[in-house]
Amino acid sequence: MMTQSIRRSMLTVMATLPLLFSSATLHAQANSVQQQLEALEKSSGGRLGVALINTADNSQILYLADERFAMCSTSKVMAAAAVLKQSESDKHLLNQRVEIKASDLVNYNPIAEKHVNGTMTLAELGAGALQYSDNTAMNKLIAHLGGPDKVTAFARSLGDETFRLDRTEPTLNSAIPGDPRDTTTPLAMAQTLKNLTLGKALAETQRAQLVTWLKGNTTGSASIRAGLPKCWVVGDKTGSGDYGTTNDIAVIWPENHAPLVLVTYFTQPEQKAESRRDVLAAAAKIVTHGF
């Protein structure tokens, strides 16, 4: 009886002061999330950046979201999107074939190495770069666009003044602390990823192709996806580099909720540090709790 009375009293207070209660609750929840992310970062021994956008109301959860981090292979999303943008005015572009030579191969080429002395279409290169993180595929996309600066120019055309791509694979993964090359911020990347996959940055056909590629990613099972309910749909792009840099950027479709856009960037002090995908999974679990 006493429990029921307490519940009725709480409901009365909530009904009488909904705005005050809601504001206090949200503030407490936000503080809890920040504290959990801070504790995660401290225990990991590295630097963690997180940006989550809830597209239901455009609210955000941010942690070091305005600090620069090396993008590593998450930059492949921008290069692939730039080619998709070109295809809006050239319907045959994605079928254009690109020669693959043995001398093109770099340090990680799971798809391109199967096509040495042959060709791949730009569509195949886009899929290889995004779904298998093929570095030769990324370099071919960059070459087609005219160089890293053209990828940056595409970002600027979207209103992203933060993204910068300076090098090709694999040197763009050096992730030297304090080096601004090949970096962005979690918030800038989250906003751009939202525009590319859920907004109007690309025409519908091209937007759908980008989302399809991201949903088909094969490299993200231990990163953001590992921190989410199995029934949620995820499209993501991972990245890794020196200094134990471990990244993942994702569009997430929870059950019965508007999409979420989540960027998790993590780096460490030692150049030879191991990747920490578990940190990204833990961060994803923290910021998506309650959705």
From Swiss-Prot:
Pfam families: Beta-lactamase2
Record: active site: S73 (acyl-ester intermediate)
Gene3D superfamilies (alphabetical): DD-peptidase/beta-lactamase superfamily
Origin: domain of life: Bacteria
GO terms, biological process: beta-lactam antibiotic catabolic process; response to antibiotic
The enzyme's E.C. designation: 3.5.2.6
Record's signal peptide: 1-28
Binding site for substrate: K237, T238, G239
Catalytic activity: a beta-lactam + H2O = a substituted beta-amino acid
Molecular function GO terms recorded: beta-lactamase activity
UniProt cross-references to PROSITE patterns, sorted A to Z: BETA_LACTAMASE_A
InterPro entries: Beta-lactam/transpept-like, Beta-lactam_cat, Beta-lactam_class-A, Beta-lactam_class-A_AS
Keyword line: Antibiotic resistance, Hydrolase, Plasmid, Signal
Family membership: Belongs to the class-A beta-lactamase family.
Function: Has cefotaxime-hydrolyzing activity.
More details: The class A beta-lactamase family has a specific amino-acid numbering system, sometimes called Ambler or ABL numbering and often misspelt as Amber. A multiple sequence alignment was used to derive a consensus sequence and then the consensus was numbered taking into account insertions and deletions. This allows use of identical numbers, e.g. for active site residues, despite differences in protein length. UniProt always uses natural numbering of residues, hence there appear to be differences in numbering between this entry and some papers.
Full protein name: Beta-lactamase CTX-M-5
Lineage of the species this protein comes from: Bacteria, Pseudomonadati, Pseudomonadota, Gammaproteobacteria, Enterobacterales
